[in-house]
Amino acid sequence: GWIVNKAASIGVKGSKHKECTVCKKVLETAEIPALSRISISKASVTLSTSTYAYDGKAKKPGVTVKLNGKTLKNGTDYTVSYSNNTKVGTAKVTITGKGNYTGSVSKTYSIKNNFKKATVSGISTKAFTGKNITQSITVKYNGKTLKNGTDYTVSYSNNKKIGTATVKIAGKGSYTGTITKTFK
């Protein structure tokens, strides 16, 4: 069989030979082709979180990178960089191949206005009618009046019987988070 003189590595050819088993004379030599780096561009990238609430701090989700069923190692097989990851909008994480890997792949995630910082007005005690009771809600974020259906959704529970009802106002679109209020 072949005896390896020098193993091939990425970008570097190797060599091997066959020798006589009795006298050890080299009978044949051959080149081992250089190994090529594998492109990371088709890797699947999973983020630990895809939506963040804005708080002025850089958002860096955890990253899992898989290629051909193998989970790659951060620092060994790839490096991670983030861009546009502090302000409200679309942020990006870029995975760049390292070591045995080449190329890059990117994934985006969202940073949305923190709906919990919105102010809600128009919730008051209502008289029992035997019907579902709703409220004339106004939601403001940094002084701007938000639109029901576009910026938030409203849902009610326990709002037909006498007692405490709950209204849940959930951020939508460029807002994330939920505000819960009660009324009687």
Residue ranges of each PLM-predicted region?
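Serine/threonine-rich, repeat-prone extracellular segments and beta-strand-based repeat modules
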Residues: 1-17, 70-102, 107, 144-181
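Thrombospondin type-1
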Residues: 1-40
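General secretory precursor processing signal
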Residues: 5, 23-26, 57, 104, ...
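N-terminal cationic amphipathic segment used for targeting or macromolecule association
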Residues: 5-6, 28, 32, 41-43, ...
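Compositionally biased regions
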Residues: 10, 37-45, 49-51, 82-84, ...
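Interdomain boundary/hinge segments at the C-termini of tandem beta-sandwich modules
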Residues: 31-37, 109-113, 183-184
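Solvent-exposed, low-complexity, repeat-rich "mucin-like" stalks and linkers
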Residues: 38-70, 114-144
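Hydrophobic beta-strand residues in large extracellular and virion-surface proteins
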Residues: 45-47, 63-65, 80, 93-95, ...
